[in-house]
Every structure is written in structure tokens, then in C-alpha cells.
């Protein structure tokens, strides 16, 4: 019997405020609602899904380190850390787990400081501007990538 594939979904700072914070940019769904949809999608594909949201950079880095050898794919919305965190980039490169970067809003249509990502050039893909559905698309792509490896 083969072990189930495992996908880790990481969400960065302030995403715990989804549903309340700037709904014109981020939509009205809460993070809990988004994660529930992802869990259902993963279960249907016989995939284990883990989730962590943190406002602390070091907690996200620790989760990435702990994923080594245990997680097959990462979906990450680094939020504001996108534009500032070389440490997150280094952690992802260090564990060499494939990842997709997700953003609810179109970061390229917003303030200039949001246009640069420290992760995008190393990601398997980047999804932005599609709201909460972007997570579903990222999970579908991750599942397809894992199935192709089997």
C-alpha cells in the first residue's frame, strides 16, 4: 500500500483576517472557509492536506523545515512576506519541495512595492488575482503534478 501524498498549505501575515480585511482586494470568504474547501478537494483526491497560518515569519520557516521528507508539495501565500523575506525563499530552496505561490489579489495591479516577489522565480507556478479560487487551482495543479510522478 502506498502512503498518501501530503500537501502543506501555508498562509502568511494578516490572512487570518480574511473576510474582514479589505474585501475589495481579498474577497469575503474567511480563511477557514477557504481551507475547508481545500480539505474537501484534497480528500476527494486521496491527498493529506495540512494547513498553517501565521503572522510570524519564523513559524512559517519552521513549518517548511519540518516538511522536509514528510510533505510532497507546498502551496504558499506568503502575503506581505512575499516582498521582504529572503529567509522564506532560502527555507523553500533548502528543503527542495516543489511549491506554488498564491495571492488572492493581483499584486501586479496594486502598489509598486507589491510587484516584486522573492519566491516567484523559484515557484513551479504563481497564481494571483483570482481570489480564493486561486487556492483551488493551485491545489489541482499540485495534485496533477504528484499524480504524474507516480
Curated annotation (Swiss-Prot):
The keyword Transferase does not apply. It catalyses: 3-dehydroquinate = 3-dehydroshikimate + H2O. The record marks 21 as: Transition state stabilizer. Keywords: Amino-acid biosynthesis, Aromatic amino acid biosynthesis, Lyase. Pathway: Metabolic intermediate biosynthesis; chorismate biosynthesis; chorismate from D-erythrose 4-phosphate and phosphoenolpyruvate: step 3/7. Catalyzes a trans-dehydration via an enolate intermediate. PANTHER family: CATABOLIC 3-DEHYDROQUINASE. Belongs to the type-II 3-dehydroquinase family. Homododecamer. This is 3-dehydroquinate dehydratase.
Amino acid at each position: 500500500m502506498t502512503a498518501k501524498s501530503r500537501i502543506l498549505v501555508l498562509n502568511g501575515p494578516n490572512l487570518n483576517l480574511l473576510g474582514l480585511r479589505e474585501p475589495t482586494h481579498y474577497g469575503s470568504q474567511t480563511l477557514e472557509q477557504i481551507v475547508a474547501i481545500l480539505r474537501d478537494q484534497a480528500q476527494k483526491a486521496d491527498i493529506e492536506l495540512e494547513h498553517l497560518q501565521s503572522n510570524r515569519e519564523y513559524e512559517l520557516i519552521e513549518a517548511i523545515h519540518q516538511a522536509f521528507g514528510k510533505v510532497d508539495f507546498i502551496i504558499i501565500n506568503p502575503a506581505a512576506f512575499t516582498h521582504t523575506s529572503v529567509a522564506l525563499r532560502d527555507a523553500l530552496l533548502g528543503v527542495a519541495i516543489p511549491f506554488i505561490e498564491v495571492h488572492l489579489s493581483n499584486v501586479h495591479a496594486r502598489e509598486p512595492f507589491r510587484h516584486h516577489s522573492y519566491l516567484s522565480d523559484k515557484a513551479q507556478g504563481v497564481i494571483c488575482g483570482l481570489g480564493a479560487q486561486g487556492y483551488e487551482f493551485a491545489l489541482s495543479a499540485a495534485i496533477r503534478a504528484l499524480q504524474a510522478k507516480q
